């Protein structure tokens, strides 16, 4: 088990309960979800990235206005966020201060539409290392009050300790 790093303490903590959900479960998000969460400003399909890069390389004057114009030519609207319909359920269950409260809340889910999702999330959490879950949750709470530089340093310091004494699986 490990914890989200590479600045995740900073950017996930700004997503409140949804950030806690992502940190604890390790669920991946799509570009649609990233747009919904305001983690990105634009969606450019991966098959258009090379053309965007070439357009930027070919532009002799990379002013802010020209860059915005070039990027605008490649922006598309992705599919609807899969995370958006789960947001209320995520807030309901992942807003607690302790992992055991989150897990208990998921067990107690009565909404028939949310129950399969809650059971899946509980199963994921129960497979995770206890120390990794507790650490990830604590980092999300601490990160809300720290700068990016402070979060990066905290993650670095914790990594050093983790590799020496943590619950880290090599492979």
Question: Language-model features: where?
Answer:
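Generic secretory/membrane-interface signal
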Residues: 10-15, 24, 62, 149
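CoA-thioester-processing core
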Residues: 1-19, 35-37, 52-56
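C-terminal alpha-helix plus adjacent terminal tail
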Residues: 29-32, 47-171
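Glycine-rich beta-to-alpha active-site loop
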Residues: 1-4, 21-31, 42
């Amino acid at each position: 088990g490990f914890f989200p790093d590479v600045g995740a303490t900073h950017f996930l903590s700004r997503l409140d309960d949804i950030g806690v959900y992502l940190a604890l479960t390790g669920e991946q998000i799509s570009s649609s979800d990233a747009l919904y969460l305001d983690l990105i400003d634009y969606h450019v399909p991966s098959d258009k990235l090379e053309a965007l890069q070439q357009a930027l390389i070919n532009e002799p004057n990379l002013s802010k206005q020209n860059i915005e114009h070039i990027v605008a030519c490649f922006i598309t609207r992705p599919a609807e966020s899969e995370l958006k319909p789960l947001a209320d359920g995520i807030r309901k269950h992942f807003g607690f201060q302790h992992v055991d409260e989150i897990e208990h809340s998921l067990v107690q889910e009565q909404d028939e539409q949310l129950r399969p999702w809650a059971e899946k999330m509980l199963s994921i959490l129960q497979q995770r290392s206890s120390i990794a879950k507790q650490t990830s949750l604590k980092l999300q709470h601490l990160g809300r009050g720290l700068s990016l530089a402070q979060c990066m340093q905290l993650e670095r310091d914790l990594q050093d300790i983790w590799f020496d004494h943590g619950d880290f699986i090599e492979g």
